Amino acid sequence: MAINLKRALLLSVSSATLAALLPITAISNADTLPSFKPIARGALSNDSIYFVMTDRFENGNTNNDDAGIPGGVEVNGLDKKDIGYFHGGDFSGLTSRLSYIRDLGFTSIWITPPVVQNWIQIGSAAYHGYWGIDFTTVDPHLGTESEFKAMVSRAHELGLKVIVDIVANHTGDIIKNSYGMYNYVSLDMAPYKDSRGRVFELDKFIGKQNFPKLDVKKSFPRPPVVSKVNKNIKKPAFLNDLTNYHNRGDSTFSGESSIYGDFFGLDDLFTEKPEVVKGMIKLWSSWITKFDIDGYRIDTAKHVNPEFWNAFIPKIMETARKAGKKDFGIFGEVYDANPYMLSTFVQEQSFPSVLDFGFQRHGLAFAKTDGQVPRLIDLFNQDDLYTTATQSAYGMPTFLGNHDMGRVGSFIHSATYGDEELTLRRSMLANDVLFFSRGAPVLYYGDEKGMVGDSGDKAARQDMFPTEVVEWQEEYRIGSSPIGLRSSFDVINPLQIQITQINELIARNPALRKGTQQLRKTSRSAIAFSRYLDGQEFLVILNSSEDSDTLDIPVTTDSSWEQIYGGNAKFSVAGKMVSITVPAISTVVLKAKSTFTAKDKISVNLAKIDYDFSTPNWLALRATVPGDEFVQVNFQARVKGSGKWGNVGTSDRRTFETDEVKGGLHRVFLTPRKFKSGTTIEVIAIARNENNEIAYSKVREFKITY
């Protein structure tokens, strides 16, 4: 029996019944009902990540502290008393502490770039790993390739993934120019020229094999030069070709210079050239096959042209799959807190995920002071922006501080005006926000030890092993005393105990890590949300106020509840309503004592398709399902008249009502440029409840124009 989808009313049947009623052979290609696709949570959705700066973590071999090159700090970059130079941490030391990370409850480690560095530049050393010059092997300050492989092997034995920080935007600062001037020169002022001195439009040749041949003396505003000693210092060899760099001067971090300018003087790669694209794919594919690593964090992603990522990332993922890495995690550093900006890297630039700078801003704001709940609501309502057929916000690495901006403890200590007790309480609340909210939480090493630092960058990169930096010996620590000459590994901190307990709780209750997150109820300073997976509902309530707060919270599971985390909280249950008083600056987690089964008849309505005011370049696909039971709504689209449906993405939770957002919506967003302008598309919504019952919406049409 053929079904005309345009006239189809809502179907509500189980998957098995649907298969029986609609045999494939009886349906024409144009009218085939698509199969439901569940939400894709992403490779990192079940992970918690411990971020290590290798040089500052543990010194396992003092023989490599100077990289085997004697001669002092200006030669080898070693100065253990200066926060801007190498201190001696290495792979051997990290290997010896992997069990410590495992025992904290983490599932992955992320390490700073391990490649060979341009050791000294601009009055500092490359201990951090972001000034690479030989990307084919490891820096001798950190150890040998065999020691790196041993670290990865030991991590795998302990059940830890190894995520490596990589850079595709730039290399260390080796290239100068014949004028000795480094202010940015715009394309309008001096466009690129080919090797014969003819101007060409860069946009017309990005990534294409007919990219014009360039000449060092004729193609750039200021001819690049390099010293004889550094002529072949970089590896792979294509990095020594001076025409493989933009050579336009220092970025102003605005306009075109954000892509084409040198990042603080670092040599900016000409990632529009196919030679560079091919070289980078080969380079970073080799690290997967050679060292057996499990993921990449990609530095300075926003400063590289989108075409590069759309070529690079699929090839890297292909290499990982061939190497048996089905869950190879990739996330980009896009230093921007706006979800509309961040999500473009997922929707339009092939990134599986990005670091959640929006969470960093709003999660931190919630933890360090009261009255910030609306910002968290807006953040979580925007999670739909990241939903695709293969990814969602559940796989985004979340964090509250890092090696660049500074430690979360520094932000909180400043906000509490140095009140030590309040700083500890709010730091514990910050951990609750980080670990119980959706996403893959990232803890910056030392945060569990109460490290603070008086600012970002160098000041936030303390030694975990006994430090020779006097100011770090004397520095205030949350929940503890100054470290002095001791190793941080020898001091137990209340934050460390708390984090271990949270990770243990989540390991026993995986819904708290990878389950659906549904906002339930808020007040000025408290927020409550359900975490749900496989019939089990949990309720997380966080209160940032210095006073207790009482909430009446609707839930889906008609059950009695038990408290599994937090201080003394009074709560009562009446049907599907939990009334609870949460103590000041604290968190409570409740667990339903019985599992949930669907009772409502399922149906789904697909709203009119249109551009959303908040995302003028994307189509908003919105659907509603009556009631408040846990359902997933899958959206699929196809070119009108074709038989093949394509999965757009799946929503597993409803929007929360605000002044700007209508509540109760299941949403995903479609990027129109995946279709040719003038194309009419058809869209259908498919809902599935906990009983695996399926409902189909009517099909809606939309004509793509741009």
PLM regions with names:
Residues 392-420:
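Active-site clefts of carbohydrate-active enzymes
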Residues 41-47, 55-286, 290-291, 312-321, ...:
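Substrate-binding/active-site clefts of carbohydrate-active enzymes
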Residues 57-66, 406-409, 472-474:
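Short, solvent-exposed loop/turn elements at domain surfaces
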Residues 53-56, 115, 139-142, 168-170, ...:
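Short, flexible loop/turn elements at secondary-structure junctions
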Residues 48-53, 108-113, 134-136, 161-165, ...:
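Structural recognition of the beta-strand scaffold that forms the well-ordered cores
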Residues 33, 170, 179, 186, ...:
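Active-site-proximal helices and loops of the catalytic beta/alpha 8
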Residues 2-51, 66-69, 87, 92-95, ...:
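Carbohydrate-interacting/catalytic domains
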Residues 608-706:
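Long, low-complexity serine/threonine/glycine- and acidic-rich segments characteristic of extracellular
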